[in-house]
């Protein structure tokens, strides 16, 4: 029996086009200004250091920014990039430049499951911060009340079966009690 639903966002609750055509270009356009403005913020300093570790070499601030832009172009699922994008999107949502979009049928089904007492969770390659931002500013208003928890790349890759085991342990359920929704067959196979 299904006791929880774990859903992806991009292509599942929200059009792929929203992420690819709205969020990614927004972060690409704003990343240089954001990093330069916040380069002394401890959270940003850590993200910049993480980029250097991943690249395994010393990089100037400009080289780090160019690396981050390249990762956006390549749609890389790398934690420091996702964390930085979440911070950039937060500014966009707060300023009103960004507003999330949820498919009407996805909203209706999530609401129905919530009302039936089925726990709802998000698992996305976007940071938890970005997930909460998207669902707090949607075409249906703030939907974060629907969700009992959020997972991102910190728990593991969505194509790694171990990630789903960790999520099940984290929410106190057996993996066979969790329905995973995604538009990606490789992720569905990993969750099985």
Question: What are the functions of these language-model segments?
Answer:
Residues 9, 123-127, 183:
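Short, well-ordered beta-to-alpha junction loops that form the rim of enzyme active sites
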Residues 19-70:
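Conserved phosphoryl-transfer catalytic core
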Residues 86, 95-138:
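Substrate-recognition element of Asp-dependent hydrolases with the DxDx(T/V) motif
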Residues 127-178, 189:
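Substrate-recognition "cap/lid" segment bordering the active-site pocket of phosphatases
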Residues 183-192:
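Acidic, divalent-metal-coordinating active-site segment for phosphoryl/phosphodiester hydrolysis
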